[in-house]
């Protein structure tokens, strides 16, 4: 990928290691900037957002990132109060929002929605979650957190735990990790194993093993990336109830983990990480959420400014 200026950010598969490291460098630069320096990154620009699915952290972090970078944001966070409720097409909504903004952020329940939006928009489109496919800015945030908290990514042993079938953050994370020298353990209940097509896609890039047992690997892991089992993706609630609560990270599990190991979660969480873990030095999921503002600000700065900032 040659440069970010004016580019759509649809999939981490479009980002090689060099591109990811560029985002990380600019994120570190943004973190070190004074408030007045930050406001020059996107000053005078407007970010449009379209969220067809509920979102707290992703939407608010994009808004916070744009505000911190000196820009403004506007958009649709509740489709029930917009013309979408009247039957307006995705294409028309995207075209309309593109007229009001310099870049667009889209979350949509349908696979392929972000690529479609990029085809009809004359402004850069950033994928904030498309169906069960990908969530690229979450993966960037996740890798930055690992890099910052562990001092690097290469050589780490990373466990990805929970819903590997429906979790779009998982697919983006695994593809991004394929650019680094890491070992990955994919830990899930049998019904929530990573999809066969995705296994095929990452097999040549990633050293990984699959298991249903977290206990089997937890003492070897440098990073435990926990995901929520997503009730809303299940066609049958009974099937959800069979796997709900399959893994719970509590203090007993922490005692089995390596010194210096960290726990991440894309959030929101349900009961997969006990609240008693929050105050420990291994709990990095709230810091991870904070880093999302910085990584998104850096990404917006790269997309909106020729030659970076």
UniProtKB/Swiss-Prot annotation:
What are the UniProt keywords, alphabetically?
Pyrimidine biosynthesis, Transferase
- Listed pathway(s): Pyrimidine metabolism; UMP biosynthesis via de novo pathway; (S)-dihydroorotate from bicarbonate: step 2/3
The GO terms describing molecular function are: amino acid binding; aspartate carbamoyltransferase activity
Q: What class of enzyme is it?
A: transferase
Summarize where L-aspartate binds, as residue positions. Answer: 86, 168, 228
Residues recorded as binding carbamoyl phosphate, renumbered to this chain, are 57-58, 107, 135, 138, 267-268
Signal peptide interval:
none
Cell membrane among keywords? no
As recorded in UniProt, its EC number(s) are 2.1.3.2
Give the coiled coil ranges: none
Please write the reaction equations for the catalytic activity of this protein: carbamoyl phosphate + L-aspartate = N-carbamoyl-L-aspartate + phosphate + H(+)
Q: Name one GO biological process term.
A: amino acid metabolic process
This molecule's function is given as: Catalyzes the condensation of carbamoyl phosphate and aspartate to form carbamoyl aspartate and inorganic phosphate, the committed step in the de novo pyrimidine nucleotide biosynthesis pathway.
Q: How does it assemble?
A: Heterooligomer of catalytic and regulatory chains.
The record's comment on protein family reads: Belongs to the aspartate/ornithine carbamoyltransferase superfamily. ATCase family.
Do you know which HAMAP family this protein is assigned to?
Asp_carb_tr
> What is the official name of this protein in its record?
Aspartate carbamoyltransferase catalytic subunit
Question: Gene name?
Answer: pyrB
